[in-house]
C-alpha cells in the first residue's frame, strides 16, 4: 500500500475504535495488532456460521495462500477458533494448477491422491490453540461490537 492509502486505513480504524469506545491504536504495531485480532475473531464468527451449515464437525482450519506465511496471524486464529490451524501451502493457486495438470497427465488419479502428493511435497505448519479462555472473552466482546 502507498503511504497515503495506509494513512486512510489507519484513520478509518482509529475512527471506528473511537466511535465504538475501544482503545484507539496509535502506533503502527497497535494498528497491526488491532487488524490481526479483528481478523482472527472474524474468522471465528464465519467458522461458527459455517458449522451451522454442516453436519460434520470441523476439526482443523486450513489456511492457504500468502496469509499462511504469517505465523502470528495463524497462531491468533487458532487461539480464536479454538481448533488447530494448518497453514500452507502459500502458493495454493500455482499448486492447484500443477495438480490439475498431474490429474490430466495421469500422475494423480483423484483428489485424495492429489492431497497426499501435496502433503508429502510441501511442509505444512500446525498452530495449536493457546489462551482459549482469553480469546473466548474477546470473542464475546467482539460480537457486542458488530
Model-derived segments and spans:
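Single conserved hydrophobic/aromatic residue that forms the stacking wall/gate
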Residues: 1-5, 9
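Charge-rich, solvent-exposed alpha-helical interaction surfaces
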Residues: 12, 16, 138-141
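Short, flexible active-site recognition loops that position polar ligands and cofactors
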Residues: 22, 35, 123-136
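Catalytic phosphate/nucleotide-handling subdomain of diverse soluble enzymes
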Residues: 49-130
